[in-house]
Amino acid sequence: MTKQPKVRKPHPVLHGIGLVLSVILLVAVLVGTYVLSTMATIIDSFIGAPSGHYSDAEIADTKVKAEALAADVEAEGTVLVQNNDNTLPLAADNKKINVFGWASTAWLGGGSGSGGVSGVNTDLLAALTAYGVAYNTELTDMYKDFQDGREYIRTLSAWPEQSGRLYEPDINNQTYYTQSMLDNAKSFSDTAVVVIGRLAGESNDATKQQYKRIEKGGDIVVDDTRTMLELTTEEENLLNYVGANYAHVVVLINSTNVMELGQIETIPGIDACLIAGLSGSEGATAVPEVLWGDREPSGRTADTWAYDLTTAASYANAGLEGVGKYSAADGLYPADGTTNGNLDTPYTYEQVSYVDYAEGIYIGYKWYETADAEGYWDAESNEHGTGYDAVVQYPFGYGLSYTSFDWKVTDAAANGSALTKDGNVTVKVAVTNTGDRAGKDVVQLYYTAPYTAGEIEKSSVELGAFAKTKELAPGESEEVTLTVPVSDMASYDAYDANHNGFTGYELDAGDYIFTVRHDAHDVDDDANATITCSLPAGVQYAEDTATGNAVSNKFTGSDAIDGVSLDGSDSDQNITYLTRADFAGTFPKTNTPTRAMTDNVKALNFYTADEANGWINDADEAITTGAKNGLKIEDNGETTDLGFRLGSDFNDPQWDALLDQLTVDEMENLYINAYGGLAELKSVGKSKSKDADGPAQIGGFTGMGAGTGFPGSSTLAQTWNADLAQEEGRTIGTQALQNGYTGWYAPATNMHRSPFNGRNYEYYSEDSLLSGVICGNTVTGANQAGVYTYVKHFICNDGESGIYRDSVYTWMTEQTLRETYLRPFQMLVEDYDAVGLMSSYNRIGAVWTGGSEALLTGILRDEWGFDGAVITDYCDHHSYMNGDQALRAGGSLWMAGFTGGEMAFEAGSNSYLQALRRATKEALYMYLHVRVTNRDYADNIGDTTAVRHAFTTSVFGWRHLVALIDIVAVVLFALAVRGVVIDVKLRKAAKTEKKNF
């Protein structure tokens, strides 16, 4: 019997399902491949392996040194503001304490957002244990059980009322503070340390209400009578209790922001208070060392601490409530249906927003001291004092010490002299430690310029110079020198307010008074502490004193390059600006909640093709691309002689030959895909490089290769120590290289315009000079390490009003812009060799800062002579942050993020290509210039091992993996198709056989 062959049966359902699934898989894989291809440069930056020639031992050694430095910053940045009866330092044999306050179990190392730290490895409690202090765990366990950490620590993914929640059980609630617990605590120790904590951060300003949880798992209680920056009633009750029941009571302020602390003075039994700031990931180790006197708290306040924050001239126009809403703005950004990318869930923008800087130049001490000089506070009287003393608790620059100092002005030769246009005023002060403990002191020199009512606005005092001593042993002295360039005292007169026919920087004739002070208010009692100089005739500075370039109005009236006056005078903003001539009549009591948007402002809401075409200049010449000149700036990641040469001189003639080698594709890729690093440029030998965010911790924001978390920038500013700032910058730069980074999205030097700004912890101070010096030295240190910085945010990112911060219109006078907000950046460019800046999310007047020709070209390049690169902030809002606009306005790099992108408007004109070539040159100069600085620094210290460059090598062949997945998907699809085809053939064959049968 012949065996019949097995008949193959079709499986149409199975193969049909297989085909559908394979099609879905293939489409998904192909779409994924396309998306990944658009992000290739960014992916390379994030997953590339660092290559910087560092051994594991060197990396470990840097980490140890960085942690020690962080502790130094924390100690020197801690400000002793109260110390009744010399309660501090605590006795060496008093090593048992009670730690009160829920915030003691949620110690803040940083704020939230890009300036935060990725984790707090050493918090207060861990630091106490490491120091050998026993604390009452019954209390801290209760706090942890009440609320285990903050529910919302990331402000970028939370609302202000969530991230700003205040947790504290009431001391009178025996559900938490049982009688036995309180009795045990008093038996445990007669010393109480109370921790007060506050958290604000990126995207969330501090709230002007309190959102509290006072019951475990309970509902949120809203207190509309107190702001987040005041003590809660529960904290006040706690302080009253410990003040009445403990022999030694110390309050620690662990806050991102200035607070109202009047009760610290008035509640009986509160002995001492330390402003500890934010300690970073490790710096809290210094806190017990300060408490017990192993370290001296030599910090000074970097801001004014007022008893009532509503007395600030910026209050009405700050925070969420200070933001106004334009009417008649339907369809404009961001009220065009755009959702807020900062939150986990989409939220549609409800309004087109604005903020008025109606306070003008009068922020911080410049307001409080000038108001005092004008008698504005004379009628004030309360439990704290009368006049100024009833208003200001801790002046700018204030701080106590564990020891005492005596000052003697040793050189006041300038007294009685006539000032000269290009001269300096120098004062020398001998500082002697007259106490019985070692310590450091800070000497501050202020000036008072002549003022005429109704003319140029001027503060009654302004910081001109400062110096911090070394650590002085008892009886030891040091002479410090303070120098104020005469030109630094010039005011910017945008309106010819003094009627001399000149607009620009100028000095009025009259007496200039210099005072040696302990803070912005307290003049030293030395007989020579006040020095008077005269200026017989007014002086005008028509040119920038550093560059010699012409200076003129760029934002005012008909001179406004961007088309609308920054002060709002030609767009019906109708802003009343605070004037010293009439403080009472012009003090901003409320903001303007709504106003109509005029057509000239509407026209600049979006960037259009017509505007792009308007940049075309037919006279612009064609550029050369793809030339084979054989020039290389790097060889296998190492800088060539040509690279060093070009990095030394932006105007070197060899630049043209190098740039001629680049292709348009290379230049566009470098410009468009700048998030996370600078692209490889094969034609000139440039390797791909990585940049990282994190002003306090390199890579900390993304968690990719994080270095040591340093104390917040405001804590660093409280050190008043330029050398310490430079060492921090150099250390962060070194850790950047060790983690494969060559660029740093930091530091940040916006102003503490208001105590409610969510990112004040990330910025330095309310004062422009202190901000510029501390930030500038940080930049210098990073440059010395060979890492370029993108100092941010250029300009006026001084509020984080939640969903309204993106594209918010900011209005002010050009004097305010230049003297207050631009001044630190000008110092960085002209004095500290900064070669990278980052623009901001907001608008400066009517135009986005990253697309403002007046800002990026008119002032930055044409006046200050800046040759480096300007990168945009993260561009997740393309409808108003336009890469074409940024390039044409003077920007250099587009932080397109993971969305990639391409030029939306014309990209073929000679004008466009010239702009692209310029931007490429600026980015390459920035990249190379810090390598020159690094080499020169290594030569100066005689250590050639200090010359290190980071570049990125492939650690993971992700393109090959993607290709393999593509192949697998195609094969599976082919097999599925084959199965269906076979099924069709089998079914046809079966039908034929059946028919024949």
Language-model features and meaning:
Residues 523-551:
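Short beta-strand elements
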